[in-house]
Amino acid sequence: MLATTIAGSLPKPSWLAEPEKLWAPWRVAPAALTEAQRDAVLIALKDQESAGIDVVTDGEQSRQHFVHGFVERLEGIDFAKRVTIGIRADRYKAEVPTVTGPIARRAPMHLDDVRWARAHTARRLKFTIPGPMTIVDTLADEHYRDRGRLAMAFAAVINEEARELAAAGLDVLQLDEPAFNVYMDDVAAWGIEALHRAVDGVRCTTAVHICYGYGIQANVDWKKTLGAEWRQYERTFPLLAKSRIDQVSLECANSRVPLELLELLRGKDIMAGVIDVATHEIETAEQVATRIRAVMRHVEPARLLPCTNCGMVPLPREVARGKLRALGAGAALVRHELSGSLPDRRAPEASEGAPTANKKNG
């Protein structure tokens, strides 16, 4: 009950990449990079376990960017042919590679990452992969020239990868789809179908993370234009409620999304963002607990997973660690209230989160 998790990324150590920066280049020589990334994963796992996080991730320590860290290993994408485009409906500009041929997966991409993390934690393990629509929105395309067709091509390679990750002991596969609250017509036209193709036959819990983005200035400024209530989810949640995805996320910390919209997701597990990633202020346990209680007016505790609003890679490491501790402690307070027992301030015992491979759990 109230199993805690994070949206995905954690800050990288300064010896691995420039801190507090998206797209930060590696600071380690190529010959030593894999070992350095794996060391960083061990730190990320330890930070989460020490904070009492129940469903842990590798913190995306082996990826420079949540999208390009996946697609850089695919055929059909030319990273030498970079162009500047507007992404997320022109919210901000980014220099991106170009699709120049058929998308294909030449070999497993993140299988070794999952095996490494799986071997070093007994907690339930989640791994994040960008969703088809968000990938399409973060690339230039000179080959398919149709966003829906390109999304289905990415869904196919995601599915190949996801099946292997689940077979390696992954408990939760999360597809990151921040584009889902930008292109609502496309969500209905082909976005949900692309998700279904991506998770077809994947034998673990599936999740979709939809959000208003990292806590970077471009996103902060954009959110100021959205009015007093953010109701974009009113169009996407009914579609997701009918989908085959198990878990859906929503930002609930310093958010203008009406929490009653969660009732459109009856039957789904909810990853509720109760940690604000757009500020360096570290929440108290009571602040987190208050946010969890507010969500519980609309979601039963058995279906609620307290979470971060989004990834925390742009934050200072000590801020992110403090927010992890607040998340774990706040959830413990509410569990105490629900059970009538004394709150356990320690990290949960490893046996509580023991994985069950190839099976729905989480």
Predicted feature locations:
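Domain-level signal for soluble alpha/beta catalytic cores
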Residues: 1-362
